[in-house]
């Protein structure tokens, strides 16, 4: 997904990929995707490397990032997407190998700072290793920031209705740490834990200790929903909340936050480039201080 997204931008050039897959299989997986469809471009393999749209991309299969010799291909930024090297100590091996900066595609497991578009990008101070947090945090944080900035959040609970992920089982299987997580993904709605809401407190310090949440894993291949239920400091009608969200989507958070009033469903957002989309028709207010937002 990172690779496909990069192909849509003229200011990013992929020069190298490290994966334990061989180049032929890597090319196959790039060409064909059950969720996102065929790759819009040419893909071939030459001398053990990928050639995409005529550009050669170095392919390696190193288990230790310190051996990757990123300096040989002029790497500026590494997208660390294995889910394994999520601390400063382990991710710094990419710096040792010659990269200038590293972006972790999941939440860091130590004090490595997390930055989320629409929440705290303005706080970035040139750190060489950062985390982009989780997909759920990226969806929740812009929404929570708009609400907190305009009305104040006293406290809140989040539920994410989350699409199936690769870590789940196709049929029931052993899962010693998470028994429910071992049940068949296509057969069940599976309650699960998530640190996404608490992570919002790391990127928006004013919300630290005010949010927590849980997840339901559901049998859909892509697109997830965040349901945020909050108690507001400043009373607001649902129409006032909608206006604040629309103003942000068209103003300060344009390109990050979306606003929709159509009768949409999850597949309408397959391939969505915005971080978060507020569904104006899906939310509901109990009163002017207690609301559910989607």
From Swiss-Prot:
Molecular function per GO: glyceraldehyde-3-phosphate dehydrogenase (NAD+) (phosphorylating) activity; NAD binding; NADP binding
Active-site residues, record numbering mapped to chain: 135
Subcellular localization(s) per the UniProt record: Cytoplasm
SMART domains for this protein: Gp_dh_N (SM00846)
Catalytic activity: D-glyceraldehyde 3-phosphate + phosphate + NAD(+) = (2R)-3-phospho-glyceroyl phosphate + NADH + H(+)
CDD domains listed in its UniProt record: GAPDH_I_C, GAPDH_I_N
Annotated positions for site Activates thiol group during catalysis: 162
Stored InterPro entries: GlycerAld/Erythrose_P_DH, GlycerAld_3-P_DH_AS, GlycerAld_3-P_DH_cat, GlycerAld_3-P_DH_NAD(P)-bd, Glyceraldehyde-3-P_DH_1, NAD(P)-bd_dom_sf
GO biological process, alphabetically ordered: glucose metabolic process; glycolytic process
Binding site for NAD(+): 19, 63, 105
GO terms for cellular component: cytoplasm
Enzyme Commission no: 1.2.1.12
Keywords, alphabetical: Cytoplasm, Glycolysis, NAD, Nucleotide-binding, Oxidoreductase
Name of a matching Pfam family: Gp_dh_C
Record pathway: Carbohydrate degradation; glycolysis; pyruvate from D-glyceraldehyde 3-phosphate: step 1/5
Family of this protein: Belongs to the glyceraldehyde-3-phosphate dehydrogenase family.
Subunit structure: Homotetramer.
PANTHER family: GLYCERALDEHYDE 3-PHOSPHATE DEHYDROGENASE, GLYCERALDEHYDE-3-PHOSPHATE DEHYDROGENASE-RELATED
Name of this chain's protein: Glyceraldehyde-3-phosphate dehydrogenase
């Amino acid at each position: 997904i990172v690779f496909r997204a990069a192909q849509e931008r003229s200011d990013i050039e992929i020069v190298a990929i490290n994966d334990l897959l061989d180049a032929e299989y890597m090319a196959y997986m790039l060409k064909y995707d059950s969720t996102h469809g065929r790759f819009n471009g040419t893909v071939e393999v030459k001398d053990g490397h990928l050639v995409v749209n005529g550009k050669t991309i170095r392919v390696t299969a190193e288990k230790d990032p310190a051996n990757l010799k990123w300096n040989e291909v002029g790497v500026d930024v590494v997208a660390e997407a294995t889910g394994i090297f999520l601390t400063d100590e382990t991710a710094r091996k990419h710096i040792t190998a010659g990269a200038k900066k590293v972006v972790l595609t999941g939440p860091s497991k130590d004090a490595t700072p997390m930055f989320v578009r629409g929440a705290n990008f303005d706080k970035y101070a040139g750190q060489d290793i950062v985390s982009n947090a989780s997909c759920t945090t990226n969806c929740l944080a812009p929404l929570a920031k708009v609400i907190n900035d305009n009305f104040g959040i006293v406290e809140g609970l989040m539920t994410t209705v989350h699409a199936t992920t690769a870590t789940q089982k196709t049929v029931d299987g052993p899962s010693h740490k998470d028994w429910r997580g071992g049940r068949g993904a296509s057969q069940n709605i599976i309650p699960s834990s998530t640190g996404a809401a608490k992570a919002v407190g790391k990127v928006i310090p004013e919300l630290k200790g005010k949010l927590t949440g849980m997840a339901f894993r559901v049998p859909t291949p892509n697109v997830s929903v965040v349901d945020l239920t909050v108690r507001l400091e400043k009373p607001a009608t649902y129409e006032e909340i909608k206006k604040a969200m629309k103003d942000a989507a068209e103003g300060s958070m344009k390109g990050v936050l979306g606003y929709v009033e159509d009768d949409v469903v999850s597949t309408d957002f397959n391939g969505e480039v915005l971080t978060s989309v507020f569904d104006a028709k899906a939310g509901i207010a109990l009163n002017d201080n207690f609301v559910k937002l989607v």
